[in-house]
C-alpha cells in the first residue's frame, strides 16, 4: 500500500473480531487490514469511530487493546452497541460532525486517531424497513436519525426543477430532469410512499434500461445524501477532526463515491494541520472485492497531524 509504515503490523480481521466481540453484533468492515495498518491501534491509545454502525471497524481497534469512542446518530445502531457491551467501547449518541462538542462533554480533548466510514452500514442496507434499498418494498424513509424530513417528503414536496437539481448534484445522474418529470407526473395521481413505488417510476423514466446497474441507484443515493446532509456532515467532521487529533494522530476516511472522495482529497491537500499520507486512495484488494462486493467502491485516504517537536 502507498502509506507510511505504521508502528504495528496488520491483523487478520477474522481473528480480531473473534477476540473482541460476541457473534450477535457483527458487521464485516471494508479495508480492515488497511485501517489497522493506518491507525496502528495499541493499548493506551484512544480512537474515535465517528460512524460506529455495526462496530466492525471498532472491533479491530478494540482487539488491539485500544479505547474507542463510537459515535452514531442511528438509535438502532446505538442500542445494538450498548447491548453488545464491548470492553473499551464508549458509545456517544450524535452526528460525527459534532464530535468537537461530543468528545469534550465525555471528558476527551485529544485522541490518537479518528475513523470515518462514510455512508450506510451494511446492516442498515439489509434492514428493509429503513427504506434505503430499491429492491425491497418499504416506507420511503432513508433517515439515519429518524428526525427531519424523509425521502418521501422530498419526492412529494420539491418542485420539478428542485428535484432535478438534487438528483443531478448528489447522484450525478445524467437523466435527472427526465426522472424528476416522471416523479412529478406520478405524484399528481397518488403520493409516492414506498421504495419500490419510486424505483418503478425511475425505471419507466430511464431510457433504454437493460440488465446491469439498476436505474434507481443514483437517485436513491442522491435522496439519502440530501435527507441526511451527508456531504455537509463530512465537511464539518473533517474540520472537527483537525482540532481533536493529538500530535502524530491520524485521520482515516473511507468513502464510497466520487462526491465524498473529492471532498476528502481537497480537505487533506488544503489542510494546514494534516499531511496526506496517501497520494492516491487505497482500494480493496481483488480478493476482498470478491468476498465483499460492497468493498468494490471503497476508497481510503489518510492524513496525519505533525508529531510534537522533540523535547516539547
UniProtKB/Swiss-Prot annotation:
Query: What are its E.C. numbers?
Result: 2.1.1.199
Where is it located? Cytoplasm
Catalytic function, reaction form: cytidine(1402) in 16S rRNA + S-adenosyl-L-methionine = N(4)-methylcytidine(1402) in 16S rRNA + S-adenosyl-L-homocysteine + H(+)
| Binding-site residues for S-adenosyl-L-methionine, renumbered to this chain | 55-57, 72, 96, 117, 124
One cellular component term (GO) for this entry is: cytoplasm
Q: Which GO terms describe its biological process?
A: rRNA base methylation
Record key words, sorted: Cytoplasm, Methyltransferase, rRNA processing, S-adenosyl-L-methionine, Transferase
Which top class of enzyme applies to this chain? transferase
- Segments of this protein annotated with the region Disordered: 1-24, 288-312
Disulfide cross-links:
none
Question: Which molecular-function annotation in GO is an example for this chain?
Answer: rRNA (cytosine-N4-)-methyltransferase activity
Question: NCBIfam families annotated for this entry?
Answer: 16S rRNA (cytosine(1402)-N(4))-methyltransferase RsmH
The family classification in the record reads: Belongs to the methyltransferase superfamily. RsmH family.
This protein is called Ribosomal RNA small subunit methyltransferase H
Amino acid at each position: 500500500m502507498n502509506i507510511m509504515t505504521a508502528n504495528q503490523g496488520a491483523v487478520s480481521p477474522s481473528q480480531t473480531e473473534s477476540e473482541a466481540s460476541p457473534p450477535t453484533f457483527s458487521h464485516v468492515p471494508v479495508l480492515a487490514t488497511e485501517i489497522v495498518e493506518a491507525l496502528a491501534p495499541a493499548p493506551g491509545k484512544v480512537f474515535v469511530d465517528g460512524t460506529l454502525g455495526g462496530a466492525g471497524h471498532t472491533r479491530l481497534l478494540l482487539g488491539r487493546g485500544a479505547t474507542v469512542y463510537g459515535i452514531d446518530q442511528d438509535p438502532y445502531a446505538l442500542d445494538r452497541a450498548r447491548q453488545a457491551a464491548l470492553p473499551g467501547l464508549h458509545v456517544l449518541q450524535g452526528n460525527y460532525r459534532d464530535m468537537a462538542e461530543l468528545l469534550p462533554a465525555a471528558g476527551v480533548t485529544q485522541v490518537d486517531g479518528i475513523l470515518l466510514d462514510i455512508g450506510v452500514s451494511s446492516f442498515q442496507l439489509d434492514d428493509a424497513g429503513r427504506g434505503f434499498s430499491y429492491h425491497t418494498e418499504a416506507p420511503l424513509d432513508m433517515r439515519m436519525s429518524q428526525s427531519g424530513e424523509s425521502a418521501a417528503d422530498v419526492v412529494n414536496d420539491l418542485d420539478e426543477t428542485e428535484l432535478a437539481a438534487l438528483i443531478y448534484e448528489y447522484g450525478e445522474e445524467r437523466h435527472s430532469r427526465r426522472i424528476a418529470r416522471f416523479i412529478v407526473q406520478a405524484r399528481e395521481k397518488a403520493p409516492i410512499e414506498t421504495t419500490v413505488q419510486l424505483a418503478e417510476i425511475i425505471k419507466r423514466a430511464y431510457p433504454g434500461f437493460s440488465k446491469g446497474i439498476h436505474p434507481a441507484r443514483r437517485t436513491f443515493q442522491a435522496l439519502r445524501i440530501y435527507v441526511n446532509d451527508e456531504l455537509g456532515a463530512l465537511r464539518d467532521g473533517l474540520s472537527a477532526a483537525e482540532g481533536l487529533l493529538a500530535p502524530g494522530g491520524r485521520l482515516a476516511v473511507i468513502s464510497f463515491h466520487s462526491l465524498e472522495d473529492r471532498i476528502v482529497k481537497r480537505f487533506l491537500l488544503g489542510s494546514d494541520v494534516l499531511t496526506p499520507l496517501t497520494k492516491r486512495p487505497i482500494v480493496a484488494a481483488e480478493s476482498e472485492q470478491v468476498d465483499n462486493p460492497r468493498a468494490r467502491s471503497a476508497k481510503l485516504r489518510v492524513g496525519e497531524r505533525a508529531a510534537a517537536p522533540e523535547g516539547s
